[in-house]
């Protein structure tokens, strides 16, 4: 019975995915993923990216956010991206494949960032979802805490942080933590984010000294 339910749910997801207007637009424009549109909407409202910036992209594959960031920071900007999954090359993106939770991968990522601080850290990381919120939410919160730790390590004063978070247990506490570190914090639900999804995007600007 459980397999039948999972099969029906998977079929429903596939049908919804391939009829999604943002998926269709992404395919038409040759974009890596529909996530490109989420970041574009955030940029239109919050003006995060500027030419010459250095950006760290966590959970980058298949590359929608990296692709968008490169288009905004111009040739003298830089994107350093990391994901457990492989990602086809993008001009202007330094990609590291590996598990961000692994100490060796984190060390390599920090070496690629170098001594200079970055202007933006963004994370679209999400765990493999089981469909059980009691399992999925803690896994998700662990990843977003790691992303915030990256901000503490590499983000410049006045820098910005964009992170996907699934609403549930621990969300309010995480939001308070971000507010203690940044001057301006907003919660965004882009149109390209499916309405029934628990995901929201926290956009934090003005990292405090």
From Swiss-Prot:
Belongs to the class I-like SAM-binding methyltransferase superfamily. RNA methyltransferase RlmE family. NCBIfam families: PRK11188.1, rrmJ. This is Ribosomal RNA large subunit methyltransferase E. SUPFAM superfamilies: S-adenosyl-L-methionine-dependent methyltransferases. The active site is at residue 164. Pfam families: FtsJ. Its main location: cytoplasm. The gene is rlmE. GO terms for cellular component: cytoplasm. Its EC number is 2.1.1.166. It comes from the Bacteria. Specifically methylates the uridine in position 2552 of 23S rRNA at the 2'-O position of the ribose in the fully assembled 50S ribosomal subunit. S-adenosyl-L-methionine binds at residues 63, 65, 83, 99, 124. HAMAP family: RNA_methyltr_E. InterPro entries: RNA_methyltr_RlmE (IPR050082), RNA_MeTrfase_FtsJ_dom (IPR002877), rRNA-MeTfrase_E (IPR015507), rRNA_MeTrfase_gammaproteobac (IPR004512), SAM-dependent_MTases_sf (IPR029063). GO terms for molecular function: rRNA (uridine-2'-O-)-methyltransferase activity. It is found in: Cytoplasm. It is an enzyme of class 2 (transferase).
